[in-house]
């Protein structure tokens, strides 16, 4: 079965800058370590909706027509990646603006100005030159890409969007329950996600993104409900069960 627009899939990839061969992103932990990248919290196949805006345009188009398990090497021009560089996005900002916020800018520093992320190029003469272009703007990229899985079950599609928008080391996706009935999706998240250090706003935004991708891409779904359930437990019985399991491993 070939991948089509609107499909839920899981992909693996390594992305490089064509000109230098520099690895800038990967789903493989070993590759990240070898490339000296900052280690992500979670590696492994990434779930996406094809055409859902989860990938850059060139990568989104590259997966269409691929089969499950198929691998491909693709080259993506700047206009289908992170765009061409725009000289207007390199700006001079008075040092006083930073001093008022208690910021000491230095070359290479990343910062956010009026909601836009930029990189400090240099600091000179009381002014700071900041580049608001994406760091990969203007670069041709290469990807080694693999379609790991084409997801067909609706409940698994829902779980894939949870993994995409709410990645968590605490979460066991198999302990997340999904029910779909009468046009409504009911999600019981793995209770361990409650221990994530996230703001209320971050949790709300993640849930909105999950819901949006579900109702836009799973036919018949009109409503998504997140259910927080707290159950009384027999803690003593659970501790004994864990002791038995630990003894069995010795």
Swiss-Prot record:
Broad enzyme group: isomerase
InterPro entries, A to Z: FKBP26_C (IPR040825), FKBP26_IF (IPR054016), PPIase_dom_sf (IPR046357), PPIase_FKBP_dom (IPR001179), SlpA/SlyD-like_ins_sf (IPR048261)
Enzyme Commission code(s) on record: 5.2.1.8
Record bears the keyword Chaperone: yes
Boundaries of every PPIase FKBP-type domain copy: 6-94
GO function term, MF aspect, one: peptidyl-prolyl cis-trans isomerase activity
Catalytic activity: [protein]-peptidylproline (omega=180) = [protein]-peptidylproline (omega=0)
Keywords: Chaperone, Isomerase, Rotamase
Domain of life: Archaea
Disulfide topology: none
Gene3D superfamilies: 2.40.10.330, 3.10.50.40, 3.30.70.2210
IF: region residues: 85-136
SUPFAM superfamilies (alphabetical): FKBP-like
Protein family per UniProt: Belongs to the FKBP-type PPIase family.
UniProt note: domains: Contains an N-terminal PPIase domain, an IF (Insert in the Flap) domain and a C-terminal domain (CTD). Aggregation suppressing activity against chemically unfolded protein is exerted mainly by the CTD while N- and C-terminal domains contribute to thermal protein aggregation suppression. The CTD probably contributes to hexamerization.
Role noted for this protein: Catalyzes the cis-trans isomerization of peptidyl prolyl bonds and accelerates protein folding. Also exhibits chaperone-like activity. In vitro, can use oligopeptides such as N-succinyl-Ala-Leu-Pro-Phe-p-nitroanilide and N-succinyl-Ala-Ala-Pro-Phe-p-nitroanilide as substrates. The PPIase activity is much lower than those of other FKBPs reported against oligopeptidyl substrates. As a chaperone, protects green fluorescent protein (GFP) and rhodanese from thermal denaturation or aggregation, and suppresses the aggregation of chemically unfolded rhodanese and elevates the yield of its refolding.
Record note on quaternary structure: Homohexamer.
Protein name listed in UniProt: Long-type peptidyl-prolyl cis-trans isomerase
Organism of origin: Methanothermobacter thermautotrophicus (strain ATCC 29096 / DSM 1053 / JCM 10044 / NBRC 100330 / Delta H) (Methanobacterium thermoautotrophicum)
Lineage: Archaea, Methanobacteriati, Methanobacteriota, Methanomada group, Methanobacteria
